[in-house]
């Protein structure tokens, strides 16, 4: 049960008002947190509970399905405890930003850049938030649900690709 998970118990003790939901599916625990507390919660997970590896940062676009529109998802792993934890934080379309966790895990740096590039989520205080996959002159964020399926009307890229 997710409620008996050590990390969930400790998170609820320290950040009760910021823990919005806890779920378990196929043995993996997902904790939804308030976006305003994401850095504090991540720092606590790393320093106190030994979640020393951020393996992935991604985002989901729920356009027309739920609010907030975006959900930023952090996949975390504790090497000493051999334990996984998924952390989620909602990000509204009107203020499509969340604080960076690259100050907690260096591995989040390029992962957040990818989310910014493809989904348009801004990571506040990120050390180098710029496109990482698309060209610098690319218009829009191609993994958003409202992005045109055929891409934007534009000239083919004439720059060097490799």
From Swiss-Prot:
Q: What are the record keywords, sorted?
A: Cell inner membrane, Cell membrane, Membrane, NAD, Quinone, Translocase, Transport, Ubiquinone
Subcellular location(s) per record:
Cell inner membrane
**How does this chain sit within the bilayer?**
Peripheral membrane protein
The name under which this protein is listed is NADH-quinone oxidoreductase subunit C
Q: Which domain of life is it from?
A: Bacteria
Q: State the protein's purpose.
A: NDH-1 shuttles electrons from NADH, via FMN and iron-sulfur (Fe-S) centers, to quinones in the respiratory chain. The immediate electron acceptor for the enzyme in this species is believed to be ubiquinone. Couples the redox reaction to proton translocation (for every two electrons transferred, four hydrogen ions are translocated across the cytoplasmic membrane), and thus conserves the redox energy in a proton gradient.
Which Gene Ontology MF annotations are present? Answer: NADH dehydrogenase (ubiquinone) activity; NADH:ubiquinone reductase (non-electrogenic) activity; quinone binding
Q: Would the keyword Ligase turn up in this protein's UniProt record?
A: no
Q: Which InterPro entries match?
A: NADH_DH_suC (IPR010218), NADH_quin_OxRdtase_su_C/D-like (IPR037232), NADH_UbQ_OxRdtase_30kDa_su (IPR001268), NADH_UbQ_OxRdtase_CS (IPR020396)
What broad class describes the main subcellular location of this protein? Answer: membrane
- From which organism does this entry originate? Geobacter sulfurreducens (strain ATCC 51573 / DSM 12127 / PCA)
Query: How is the quaternary structure described?
Result: NDH-1 is composed of 14 different subunits. Subunits NuoB, C, D, E, F, and G constitute the peripheral sector of the complex.
Its gene name is nuoC
Q: Which reaction does it catalyse?
A: a quinone + NADH + 5 H(+)(in) = a quinol + NAD(+) + 4 H(+)(out)
For this record, the Gene Ontology CC terms, alphabetical, are: plasma membrane
